[in-house]
A protein has these predicted regions:
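Interfaces that engage single-stranded nucleic acids at replication/repair/recombination sites
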Residues: 1-62
Length: 62
């Protein structure tokens, strides 16, 4: 199984956050980051990357 690097995770999170922001606004994306104790993608704990990506991805494809 291939593991994404932290840089790959951050790039995916940032791209997905941009898509989610187009649909729901910056406040919705900020809410997701705040749930994980961050104000932006760079402030996230790497252990939360997959969870944050999953939430943002769901928003972006709704």
């Amino acid at each position: 199984m291939y593991q994404l690097s932290n840089e790959d995770w951050l790039m995916n999170i940032e791209n997905t956050a941009a898509e989610a922001e187009k649909k729901y606004g910056a406040e919705a994306v900020e809410f997701v980051f705040k749930k994980y104790g961050a104000t932006c993608s760079e402030g996230l704990n790497p252990s939360d990357y997959s969870e944050v990506f999953g939430e943002l991805y769901q928003m972006s494809v709704d």
